[in-house]
């Protein structure tokens, strides 16, 4: 405490002295001394402290005001527009190897990051902010402290997370908190990070601390988002619960019944559009904690806000988000085009001006970057940051419930043109975890990999954020379900089937799949048993299409969508098997489930041929 007293003005020192936690004080003293900020501000939970951060984001030029009240815009460096996978490393003890993951020797990594961060905040203001992941004062709560010299990062976290200063006071001398140290580093004249060659995001799994330097892009800097996620996955696997990359939503059943679903979808597979279906309710769009509470799986949204991709959001397809983005609620737009104080983005469905300011500085149509690429009006990864309370379809009670909500179903959403049917239900927990969650793939489009139709393996949509061995992660999933008295049903969906180049489903058909899943959770409708799980009966879907979309659902459409495509399904089993086999430390159950599914498909092929009509299986 003596050190802190030396570094801080009295009013800021008193805020820290009110927290009885020597571990926290020691950590803060060490880093304030190392970073050498010219000024330190400690954020409590008061609205005044939040307002101070908001004002500082404008004062330091990291954000600018827009025409609509409470809207601001932030720009990242032209070359700092996405998660930096190459320089995001998990620091692990010598000799530890984790397949698929970018690891580095811990001692080496700590030495390098300390060197980069030495005195990096000279002439800058350090903000010390306290937050919690999950609701406060609950079995889900994980406290976290963020050190940053970016008022934009601190402001973003106030929109995305619950404040945690009082929680730190309540908890007293605990070591059980996550730590984040961030510096944007030296800034250029546009107030964006300059030294991108020294951009580093190092995640210390031993000390549960994340260091991030010379970057501002949210995915690299907003500590509590995907950086904390790596730490909570490790914790969940160690302690026997689930920390997942999933939405949490309420599907409204007959007679006012409320059923909650979680959903894991790789990007471009329909995650946001599912969570935002207009007549259902959202609890969260990105991260959930799921715990066993008295034998039941209960889930909470880790966050209270949305850090969403804005590209393509338009009034017709995304009426709810569109309404929020045009309301005078607090929103930070990032890396969009601004003209006359109004934000514009690619694919918004209205005319975009031919000039303005964007992530490249002064912009005009046809402008090219130094590599000769044409610069679009907004970056494809441009974002909006807003609190969930701005959404009219928010289930506020579920968001704030410290006990979480009971999970009725878990959905895994893949993307392929010719393999998975639009919706199906697993036979049981193990079957769902392995053949749906652990087998998740998404077909990439030509734009991302230069090759149409490459299937990217992404189990549980978590591969980019994994911090433990994949085998341990899957083993924990299986164990978690086995200990539940009441298991959620597991479903898989695929909105992207094609035939002769044409989509087999329309965008809103997913609303019907949700209603069917809700009915199945409660055993209200029967289903057809197939080699890959249960699929809906035609009559039930016909009725739901009429009820939900006021649309006639034709028998031939049902047959095309739900036929069992044996050759493609067998090819997928081989692909998944060949990915897991060389890894080692994979649960035996995975190969057992894949083998059983293969046998069921081969048996069905003998009887019905390569492509099986759902009507043959009645």
From Swiss-Prot:
<protein>
    <recommendedName>
        <fullName>Phosphoenolpyruvate carboxykinase [GTP]</fullName>
        <ecNumber>4.1.1.32</ecNumber>
    </recommendedName>
</protein>
<dbReference type="GO" id="GO:0006107">
    <property type="term" value="P:oxaloacetate metabolic process"/>
</dbReference>
<comment type="similarity">
    <text>Belongs to the phosphoenolpyruvate carboxykinase [GTP] family.</text>
</comment>
<keyword id="KW-0547">Nucleotide-binding</keyword>
<feature type="binding site">
    <location>
        <begin position="217"/>
        <end position="219"/>
    </location>
    <ligand>
        <name>substrate</name>
    </ligand>
</feature>
<feature type="binding site">
    <location>
        <begin position="268"/>
        <end position="273"/>
    </location>
    <ligand>
        <name>GTP</name>
    </ligand>
</feature>
<dbReference type="GO" id="GO:0071333">
    <property type="term" value="P:cellular response to glucose stimulus"/>
</dbReference>
<feature type="binding site">
    <location>
        <position position="267"/>
    </location>
    <ligand>
        <name>substrate</name>
    </ligand>
</feature>
<keyword id="KW-0312">Gluconeogenesis</keyword>
<dbReference type="GO" id="GO:0042594">
    <property type="term" value="P:response to starvation"/>
</dbReference>
<dbReference type="InterPro" id="IPR008209">
    <property type="entry name" value="PEP_carboxykinase_GTP"/>
</dbReference>
<dbReference type="GO" id="GO:0004613">
    <property type="term" value="F:phosphoenolpyruvate carboxykinase (GTP) activity"/>
</dbReference>
<feature type="binding site">
    <location>
        <position position="286"/>
    </location>
    <ligand>
        <name>Mn(2+)</name>
    </ligand>
</feature>
<keyword id="KW-0456">Lyase</keyword>
<feature type="binding site">
    <location>
        <position position="83"/>
    </location>
    <ligand>
        <name>substrate</name>
    </ligand>
</feature>
<dbReference type="InterPro" id="IPR018091">
    <property type="entry name" value="PEP_carboxykin_GTP_CS"/>
</dbReference>
<dbReference type="GO" id="GO:0046327">
    <property type="term" value="P:glycerol biosynthetic process from pyruvate"/>
</dbReference>
<feature type="binding site">
    <location>
        <position position="226"/>
    </location>
    <ligand>
        <name>Mn(2+)</name>
    </ligand>
</feature>
<dbReference type="Pfam" id="PF17297">
    <property type="entry name" value="PEPCK_N"/>
</dbReference>
<keyword id="KW-0963">Cytoplasm</keyword>
<keyword id="KW-0342">GTP-binding</keyword>
<dbReference type="GO" id="GO:0005525">
    <property type="term" value="F:GTP binding"/>
</dbReference>
<dbReference type="GO" id="GO:0019543">
    <property type="term" value="P:propionate catabolic process"/>
</dbReference>
<feature type="binding site">
    <location>
        <position position="415"/>
    </location>
    <ligand>
        <name>GTP</name>
    </ligand>
</feature>
<dbReference type="InterPro" id="IPR035078">
    <property type="entry name" value="PEP_carboxykinase_GTP_N"/>
</dbReference>
<comment type="pathway">
    <text>Carbohydrate biosynthesis; gluconeogenesis.</text>
</comment>
<keyword id="KW-0210">Decarboxylase</keyword>
<dbReference type="InterPro" id="IPR008210">
    <property type="entry name" value="PEP_carboxykinase_N"/>
</dbReference>
<dbReference type="GO" id="GO:0030145">
    <property type="term" value="F:manganese ion binding"/>
</dbReference>
<feature type="binding site">
    <location>
        <position position="245"/>
    </location>
    <ligand>
        <name>Mn(2+)</name>
    </ligand>
</feature>
<feature type="active site">
    <location>
        <position position="269"/>
    </location>
</feature>
<dbReference type="InterPro" id="IPR013035">
    <property type="entry name" value="PEP_carboxykinase_C"/>
</dbReference>
<dbReference type="Pfam" id="PF00821">
    <property type="entry name" value="PEPCK_GTP"/>
</dbReference>
<dbReference type="GO" id="GO:0033993">
    <property type="term" value="P:response to lipid"/>
</dbReference>
<keyword id="KW-0479">Metal-binding</keyword>
<feature type="binding site">
    <location>
        <position position="383"/>
    </location>
    <ligand>
        <name>GTP</name>
    </ligand>
</feature>
<feature type="binding site">
    <location>
        <begin position="381"/>
        <end position="383"/>
    </location>
    <ligand>
        <name>substrate</name>
    </ligand>
</feature>
<dbReference type="GO" id="GO:0005829">
    <property type="term" value="C:cytosol"/>
</dbReference>
<comment type="function">
    <text>Catalyzes the conversion of oxaloacetate (OAA) to phosphoenolpyruvate (PEP), the rate-limiting step in the metabolic pathway that produces glucose from lactate and other precursors derived from the citric acid cycle.</text>
</comment>
<dbReference type="GO" id="GO:0006094">
    <property type="term" value="P:gluconeogenesis"/>
</dbReference>
<keyword id="KW-0464">Manganese</keyword>
<dbReference type="InterPro" id="IPR035077">
    <property type="entry name" value="PEP_carboxykinase_GTP_C"/>
</dbReference>
């Amino acid at each position: 405490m003596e050190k802190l007293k030396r570094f801080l003005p009295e009013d800021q020192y008193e805020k820290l002295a009110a927290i009885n936690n020597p571990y926290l004080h020691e950590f803060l003293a060490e880093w304030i001394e190392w970073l050498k900020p010219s000024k330190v501000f400690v954020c409590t939970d008061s609205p005044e402290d939040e307002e101070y951060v908001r004002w500082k984001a404008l004062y330091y030029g990291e954000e600018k005001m827009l025409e609509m009240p409470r809207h601001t815009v932030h720009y990242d460096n032209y070359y700092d527009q996405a998660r930096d996978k190459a320089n995001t490393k998990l620091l692990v003890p010598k000799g530890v190897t984790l397949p698929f993951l970018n690891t580095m020797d811990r001692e080496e990594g700590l030495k390098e990051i300390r060197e980069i961060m030495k005195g990096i905040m000279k002439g800058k203001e350090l903000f010390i902010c306290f937050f919690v992941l999950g609701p406060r004062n609950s079995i889900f709560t994980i406290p976290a402290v963020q050190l940053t010299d970016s008022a934009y990062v601190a402001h973003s976290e106030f929109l995305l997370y619950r404040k945690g200063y009082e929680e730190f006071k309540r908890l007293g001398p605990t070591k059980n908190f996550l730590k984040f140290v961030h510096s944007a580093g030296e800034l250029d004249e546009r107030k964006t990070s300059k030294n991108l060659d020294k951009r580093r995001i190092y995640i210390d799994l031993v000390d549960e601390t994340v260091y991030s330097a010379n970057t501002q892009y949210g995915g690299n800097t907003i500590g509590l988002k995907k950086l904390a996620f790596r730490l909570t996955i490790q914790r969940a696997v160690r302690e026997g619960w689930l920390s997942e990359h999933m939405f949490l939503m309420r599907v409204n059943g007959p007679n006012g019944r409320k059923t909650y679903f979680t959903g894991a979808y790789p990007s471009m597979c329909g995650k946001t559009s599912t969570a935002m279906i207009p007549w259902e309710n959202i609890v969260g769009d990105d991260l959930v904690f799921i715990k066993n509470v008295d034998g039941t799986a209960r889930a909470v949204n880790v966050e209270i806000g949305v850090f969403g991709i804005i590209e393509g959001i338009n009034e017709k397809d995304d009426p709810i988000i569109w309404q929020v983005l045009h309301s005078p609620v607090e929103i930070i737009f990032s890396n969009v085009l601004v003209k006359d104080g109004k934000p514009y983005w690619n694919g918004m469905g209205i005319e975009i001006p031919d000039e303005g300011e964007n992530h490249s500085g002064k912009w005009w149509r046809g402008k090219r970057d130094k590599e000769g690429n044409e610069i679009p009006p907004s970056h494809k990864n441009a974002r909006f940051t807003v609190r969930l309370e701005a959404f009219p379809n928010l289930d506020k009670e579920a968001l704030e419930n410290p006990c979480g909500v009971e999970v009725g179903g878990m959905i895994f959403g893949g993307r392929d043109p010719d393999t998975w049917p639009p919706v199906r239900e697993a036979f049981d927990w193990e079957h769902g975890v392995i053949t749906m969650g652990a087998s998740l793939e998404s077909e990439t489009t030509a734009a991302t990999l230069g090759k149409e139709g490459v299937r990217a393996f992404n189990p549980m949509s978590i591969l980019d954020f994994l911090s433990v061995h994949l085998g341990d992660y899957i083993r924990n999933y299986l164990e978690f379900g086995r200990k539940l008295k009441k298991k959620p049903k597991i479903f898989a969906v695929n909105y992207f089937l094609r035939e002769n180049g044409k989509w087999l489903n329309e965008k809103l058909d997913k609303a019907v799949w949700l209603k069917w899943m809700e009915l199945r959770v409660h055993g209200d409708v029967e289903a057809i048993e197939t080699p890959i799980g249960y699929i809906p009966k035609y009559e039930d879907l016909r009725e739901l299409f009429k009820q939900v979309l006021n649309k006639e659902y034709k028998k031939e459409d049902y047959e095309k969508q739900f036929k069992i495509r044996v050759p493609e399904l067998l090819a997928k089993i081989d692909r998944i098997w060949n990915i897991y086999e060389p890894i080692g430390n994979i649960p035996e159950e995975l190969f057992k489930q894949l083998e059983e599914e293969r046998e069921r498909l081969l048996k069905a092929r003998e009887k019905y041929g390569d492509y099986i009509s759902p009507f043959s299986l009645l």
